[in-house]
């Protein structure tokens, strides 16, 4: 299950990434590259990480008209990334176009990247969703609606809170991928995410993948922190 632990490389540039990865010589990680790092370094950072043997979740949360998303996904698939995402709010046509682009752009002999959709950001509270976004549903209802739309559109799963996983299993089935950010060790601050959980709790609730950032990247000893998270996630008693 260690490959289902994704480390968020939330750094401003390649130099910071290189410094961080020195702690992990010989480890093949599954890493997340987000907007800040990708927009600074471009596709070269993907090439660098692939050459190091790491799997990559390219977290750009595409949300645009279908043709634009299709073309963008074609380009991203050609980079040999392992996972990408879109905003479910972009609608079914956009999500279907994303899959088409990934199929067209994937490298010969390889499967297309896993494609998931963001239902609601983990920084979104129900009050914010209703007052600012204008969705007159409960947060649980809105997430379930987007997850169902995502599955019907042919995507593999969603980004969601761990707390939403059991409901989404009911709505979309056990094969539906759930990628859960907002994972913290019990001793950590929650920072800017409202809906958070520990690795142990994520495992108990049935998450497919967990995304862990600051608990590892800001630790005094990142490798030891990684091992701690991994043990909790895998249910290993030491």
From Swiss-Prot:
* NCBIfam families for the chain: PRK00230.1, pyrF
Q: Which InterPro entries match?
A: Aldolase_TIM, OMPdecase, OMPdecase_AS, OMPdecase_bac, OMPdeCOase_dom, RibuloseP-bd_barrel
| Broadest EC class assigned to this enzyme | lyase
**Role:** Catalyzes the decarboxylation of orotidine 5'-monophosphate (OMP) to uridine 5'-monophosphate (UMP).
Q: Which UniProt keywords apply?
A: Decarboxylase, Lyase, Pyrimidine biosynthesis
What is the name of the protein in this document?
Orotidine 5'-phosphate decarboxylase
Annotated metabolic or biological route of this protein: Pyrimidine metabolism; UMP biosynthesis via de novo pathway; UMP from orotate: step 2/2
Family the UniProt entry places it in: Belongs to the OMP decarboxylase family. Type 1 subfamily.
PANTHER family linked to this entry: OROTIDINE 5'-PHOSPHATE DECARBOXYLASE
- Active site residues according to the UniProt entry: 61 (proton donor)
Lyase recorded as keyword: yes
Q: In which organism is this protein found?
A: Bacillus cereus (strain AH187)
Keyword Lyase among record annotations: yes
Q: Which GO terms describe its molecular function?
A: orotidine-5'-phosphate decarboxylase activity
């Amino acid at each position: 299950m260690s490959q289902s632990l994704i480390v968020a490389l939330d750094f401003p540039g390649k130099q910071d990434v290189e410094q961080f990865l020195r702690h992990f010589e010989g480890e093949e990680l599954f890493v997340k590259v987000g907007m800040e790092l990708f927009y600074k370094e471009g596709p070269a950072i993907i090439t660098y990480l692939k050459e190091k043997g790491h799997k990559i979740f390219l977290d750009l949360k595409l949300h645009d008209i279908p043709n634009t998303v299709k073309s963008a996904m074609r380009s991203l698939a050609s980079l040999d990334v392992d996972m990408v995402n879109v905003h479910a709010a972009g609608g079914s046509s956009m999500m279907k176009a994303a899959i088409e682009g990934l199929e067209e752009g994937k490298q010969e002999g390889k499967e297309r990247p896993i494609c998931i959709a963001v239902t609601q950001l983990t920084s979104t509270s129900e009050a914010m969703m209703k007052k600012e976004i204008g969705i007159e549903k409960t947060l649980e209802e809105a997430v379930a609606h987007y997850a169902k739309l995502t599955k019907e559109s042919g995507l593999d799963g969603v980004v969601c809170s761990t707390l939403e996983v059991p409901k989404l299993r009911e709505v979309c089935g056990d094969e539906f991928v759930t990628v859960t950010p907002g994972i913290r060790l019990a001793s950590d601050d929650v920072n800017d995410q409202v809906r958070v959980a520990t690795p142990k709790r994520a495992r108990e609730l049935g998450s497919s993948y967990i995304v862990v950032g600051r608990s590892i990247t800001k630790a005094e000893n990142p490798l030891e922190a990684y091992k701690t998270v991994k043990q909790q996630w895998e249910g290993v008693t030491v």
